Structure formats: C-alpha cells, structure tokens
From Swiss-Prot:
GO BP, one annotated term: polyprenol biosynthetic process
Stored Pfam families: Prenyltransf
Full protein name: Isoprenyl transferase
SUPFAM superfamilies linked: Undecaprenyl diphosphate synthase
Keywords: Magnesium, Metal-binding, Transferase
UniProt binding sites for substrate: 26-30, 38, 42, 70-72, 74, 76, 197, 203-205
One of the record's GO molecular function terms: magnesium ion binding
Source organism of the structure: Streptococcus pyogenes serotype M6 (strain ATCC BAA-946 / MGAS10394)
EC number per UniProt: 2.5.1.-
Keyword Repeat: no
Active site: 25, 73 (proton acceptor)
Length: 249
C-alpha cells in the first residue's frame, strides 16, 4: 500500500514509466574526484542502486533493468573486474532483506558462463528468495551485450527453422522478441519506456538495442553514486514532458 507521500508524488509526476532501464555510469570518476580508488565509486554506486530501486518500487514502476556489467567490461583492469564481480555478493547480502520486504523480485539477463561461482551463487540465491514476490522486477544486466543477445536469438531461430519447428514466414518482430533474454519479463513491460544514462555520456553502449527502439532517453551529467531519489524523480518528470509517438505523427 502506497503511503500518502508516494501517492502525492505520483500525482505530481503524472504518468509513471512501467519499465525503466539505467546505464549506471560514472563510478570511477566519482571516486577520482574524491581522490579515492575506482572501486570506492563502485561501492558507493551499490548504495545508490538500493535507493533508486526502492523509490521506483514505491512509484509503481514494474521493471527496473540496470546495466551492471557489460560483455566489454572484461577488458578493464583485472583487480577492478574482480571487485565488480564481487559487488553482487555484497549487494545481495546487504540489501536483499529490505528488497524482499518491499516485494521486489530479482531477475537477470546476460551470459552466466563467465561469472565467478560465488557471484552466480549469490545471484541465484537472491532470485530464489524473491521469486514469489509480485512487485517491481529488479532486472540485472550482468555480463550482457545487446549485439550478442540478438546474435544468439538469430542462431536459435535458425536452428528451429532447420529442425522444422519454424517456417521462415513465421518470423515476426514478436517472435524474435520471444528469443531475446527479456522474454521472461511480462509481455507488456519487456521494452523500456525510459532509459537513463548518468555521467554525461550520450550513447547506449550496447544496452538493450532491440528493446529500446521506441524508448525515451534521459542523459544527465550526474555521476551514478549521486543519482538518488531526487534525480530519479527529475528524470520521470522530464519523461512526462514528452509525447511518445512510436513512429506516428
């Protein structure tokens, strides 16, 4: 049940996007500004994610997909990669209880084969603990790359055609969507209404290229660890000033 404050905020904001995607960028620069190592920024970003998730849940957002680690991030320094891979363990250990209390359901997209065993175990434990929750879906994009996702979908479709499970004429946009990693999401909420990128960068970086065809984009110079409740509300207010046409006049 929403509190009076949450209801009032929703009324002021107007329409709430059902699916928000966030490219969480700027952790390293945030740490550098404070003369700290990059990993310090990643840890602060973990706390920002918890606050944004709870806020989105209170507002009635259905899906929050966060770009936690891309397939390209493996090229970063090994000590940083190792730290980032341990972040889900720390995040779930610290925040799963409060997320569970708020009816948040944890899911993920991405290739799991390269994930360390303890990272995968923590992720699976969080997914299992929250699997019966019916509130916001916190969808981690972990070792995710949009082009790789589409390539994998094409391979599976081609194999099903070869196996006579599909005819080429059966291939539609909806069918392709069913082969993507987001097929586990509720059908009406698979594609983000709003994609937010922090830190001032103006690109998608291989994040949900298929699903974002008609998304609205919000770019902010705010670094991710500083992106808290007020910044999310500002992004949603900006979203509400736009008219979504989906290619129409």
């Amino acid at each position: 049940m929403f509190g009076l404050k949450a209801k009032s905020t929703k009324k002021v904001l107007g329409s709430i996007p059902k699916h928000i995607g966030i490219i969480m960028d700027g952790n390293g620069r945030w740490a550098k500004k404070r003369l700290k190592p990059r990993v310090f920024g990643h840890k602060a970003g973990m706390d920002a994610l918890q606050e944004v998730t709870i806020t989105a849940s209170e507002l009635g957002v259905k899906v929050l997909t966060v770009y936690a680690f891309s397939t390209e991030n493996w090229s970063r320094p090994q000590d940083e990669v190792s730290f980032i891979m341990n972040l889900p363990v720390a995040f779930f250990d610290k925040y799963v209880p409060v997320l569970h209390e708020n009816n948040v359901k944890i899911q993920m997209i991405g290739e799991t084969s390269r994930l360390p065993e303890d990272t995968l175990a923590a992720l699976n434990a969080a997914i299992d603990k929250t699997k019966r929750n019916t509130g916001l879906i916190l969808n981690f994009a972990l070792n995710y790359g949009g082009r790789a996702e589409i390539t994998s979908a094409v391979r599976f479709i081609a194999q099903d055609v070869l196996d006579a499970k599909l005819n080429p004429g059966d291939i539609t946009e909806d069918l392709i969507a069913n082969y993507l990693m987001t097929d586990h999401l509720p059908y009406l909420y698979r594609d983000p209404d709003l994609i937010i990128r922090t830190s001032g960068e103006l690109r998608l970086s291989n994040f949900l290229p298929w699903q974002s065809a008609y998304s609205e984009f919000y770019f902010t110079p705010v670094l991710w660890p500083d992106f808290k409740k007020a910044e999310l509300l500002k992004a949603i207010a900006d979203y509400n000033r736009r008219q979504r046409r989906f290619g129409k006049v």
